[in-house]
């Protein structure tokens, strides 16, 4: 056999053994992304989606009206599918060391990250924005109101069937034993002081002042639970100061201790603030008009397990997420963004009523966020209140 044939056969072996498998692997990894881009491009071409990359000037933004939250069942939001992706994932940063950070009582750290006395900078735009109803492969409607955004490999048909099932626990609204736990893995997340069309970039959007961070939103939830007679615990430990790293490890330890002491608790709600920002730095303030007032729109996150996350009962959390979503939409039309069902953990293995709730974003005012806390509390009180 001459050297030319030998070389050709060697090249053929290399192509079959290495190049083709590598190409197939790379295509498999990218196929979903290419498909999604193609779907979006087709949607743009057909007028289904309207990208919102070109921004108006600050003066135009100041006079821009809030999109009405009164959406009919058949109305599709005019916002871009890209905008739905702008909300970043909650960072579940593990502890750097093997030692879990110790949470700190809120009263001990009140002045550690003070809320700014004034914000004179005007170097960023805040745009009000209302998430509506969406069409597309990832979305399906709930019978009771609201939507789910399915970012998993499970089919929408399967999840729709599950969404109609009742939640898998019972709340004793007449019991003196706590039934609900409200806590905040990222308690220092904060908001704008007032309803504004600009922000000061020197403000970190974090504070240990409990009147201006997530603790105040939790307080509003709990005030309504009080009125409904539902026993609860509001854990005000600060898990993300002095270090953000390991905050989920810290809150997990605290929640487990509370559940051991109070096994009557069925529902654990980790209440956060989102951070939605365009590439040009514009911050979005998701809002809905509820009974003549602006409320920060909320998003429920329900985690799915791909078999590696230790959450065998994740579907029971999903049942509760759908029930709560529909109850909120029934009570306060337009308050919710679609439930995010995705491969997330967020300590949702600890009960079968564990959810994460994002209230507004860093473009919202503290008043808008606190009002949403009040509305969440009213709905929970209606769902679980006793006679």
Describe each PLM feature range.
Residues 1-15:
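N-terminal Sec-pathway targeting helices
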Residues 13-264, 275-280, 374, 382-387:
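N-terminal catalytic or cofactor-binding beta/alpha core of small enzyme domains
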Residues 179-184, 233, 267-272, 299-301, ...:
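Soluble periplasmic/extracytoplasmic beta-strand elements of cell-envelope proteins
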Residues 187-190, 238-242, 273-278, 305-308, ...:
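Solvent-exposed loop/turn segments at secondary-structure junctions
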Residues 200-204, 276-312:
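A short, glycine/acidic-enriched catalytic loop
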Residues 252-255, 280-288, 339-345:
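Alpha-helical scaffolding within the catalytic cores
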Residues 313-340:
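Active-site-adjacent substrate-binding region
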Residues 336-387:
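Active-site-adjacent mobile loop/cap segments within catalytic or ligand-binding domains
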């Amino acid at each position: 056999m001459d050297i030319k044939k030998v070389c050709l056969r060697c090249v053929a072996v290399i192509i079959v053994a290495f190049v083709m498998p590598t190409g197939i692997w790379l295509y498999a990894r990218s196929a979903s992304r290419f498909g999604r881009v193609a779907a979006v491009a087709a949607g743009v071409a057909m007028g289904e989606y309207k990208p919102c990359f070109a921004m108006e000037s600050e003066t135009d933004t100041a006079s821009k009206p809030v999109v009405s939250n009164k959406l009919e069942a058949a109305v599709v939001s005019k916002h871009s599918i890209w905008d739905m992706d702008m909300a970043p994932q909650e960072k579940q940063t593990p502890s750097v060391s093997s030692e879990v950070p110790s949470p700190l009582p809120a009263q001990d750290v009140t002045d550690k990250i003070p809320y700014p006395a004034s914000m004179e900078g005007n170097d960023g735009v805040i745009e009000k924005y209302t998430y509506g109803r969406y069409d597309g492969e990832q979305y399906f409607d709930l019978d009771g109101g609201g939507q789910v955004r399915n970012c998993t490999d499970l089919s929408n048909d399967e999840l729709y069937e599950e969404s109609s099932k009742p939640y898998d626990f019972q709340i004793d609204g007449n019991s003196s034993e706590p039934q609900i736990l409200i806590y905040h893995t990222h308690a220092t997340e904060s908001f704008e002081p007032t309803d504004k069309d600009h922000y000061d970039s020197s403000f970190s959007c974090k504070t240990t002042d409990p009147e201006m961070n997530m603790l105040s939103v939790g307080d509003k939830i709990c005030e309504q639970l009080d009125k409904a007679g539902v026993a609860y615990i509001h854990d005000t430990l600060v898990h993300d100061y002095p270090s953000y790293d390991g905050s989920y490890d810290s809150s997990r330890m605290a929640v487990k201790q509370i559940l051991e002491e109070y096994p009557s608790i069925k529902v654990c709600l980790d209440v956060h603030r989102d951070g939605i920002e365009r590439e040009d730095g514009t911050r979005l303030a998701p809002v809905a008009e509820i009974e003549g007032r602006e409320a920060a729109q909320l998003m429920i996150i329900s985690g799915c397990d791909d078999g590696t996350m230790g959450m065998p009962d994740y579907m029971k959390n999903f049942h509760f997420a759908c029930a709560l979503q529909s109850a909120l939409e029934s009570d306060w039309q337009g308050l919710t963004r679609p439930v995010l069902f995705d491969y997330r953990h967020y300590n949702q293995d600890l009960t079968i009523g564990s959810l994460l709730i994002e209230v507004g974003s860093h473009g919202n005012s503290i008043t808008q966020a606190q009002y949403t806390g009040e509305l969440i509390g009213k709905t929970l009180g209606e769902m679980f209140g006793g006679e």
